[in-house]
UniProtKB/Swiss-Prot annotation:
Gene: FLP1
Family membership: Belongs to the FPF1 family.
UniProt tissue specificity: Expressed in roots, flowers, and at a low level, in leaves.
Protein name, per record: Flowering-promoting factor 1-like protein 1
Region (Disordered): 19-42
PANTHER family (alphabetical): FLOWERING-PROMOTING FACTOR 1-LIKE PROTEIN 1
Additional observations: Overexpression of FLP1 results in shortening of the time to flowering.
One BP term from GO: regulation of flower development
InterPro entries the record matches: FPF1
Domain of life where this protein originates: Eukaryota
Composition bias, Low complexity: 22-39
Function: Modulates the competence to flowering of apical meristems.
Length: 124
């Protein structure tokens, strides 16, 4: 079960399973907190801080990661649906979906944590 916990206008919390596909039929909440909810659900972007470049493709991300010492990791089982990067100086592994359209904030924050002060996740 995944989703986002939101407050109704009467103060009761509820779980919204998939906030991006929530039906418009729930008008009781949309009038008071719909704007705030939309702000929390904005798309995220990954920004390379030294160059202020927005990462818009795996090509640009791979170039930046290589400059930081990351190498492509080819694992026999996962090559068809995952891109993986590792650093020889650590045990860290970055695993990303091969399809860039499935690259989301979870993957972005994984990159940020493993590369402190180099990347930042921002609202679009």
């Amino acid at each position: 079960m995944s989703g986002v916990w939101v407050f109704n206008k009467n103060g009761v919390m509820r779980l919204v399973e998939n906030p991006y596909n929530q039906s418009a039929g729930d008008s009781s909440e949309s009038s008071s907190s719909g704007g705030n909810q939309q702000q929390r659900m904005r798309r995220k972007i990954l920004v390379h801080l030294p160059s202020s470049e927005v990462v818009s493709s795996y090509g640009s991300l791979e170039k930046i990661l290589k400059n930081l010492g990351w190498e492509r990791y080819y694992s026999g089982d996962n090559t068809d649906h995952l891109l993986q990067f590792h650093k020889r100086t650590s045990i860290d592994l970055i695993s990303l979906p091969r399809d860039f359209s499935k690259f989301n904030s979870i993957h972005m924050y994984d990159i940020v944590v493993k590369n402190p002060n180099v990347f930042h996740v921002r609202d679009m």
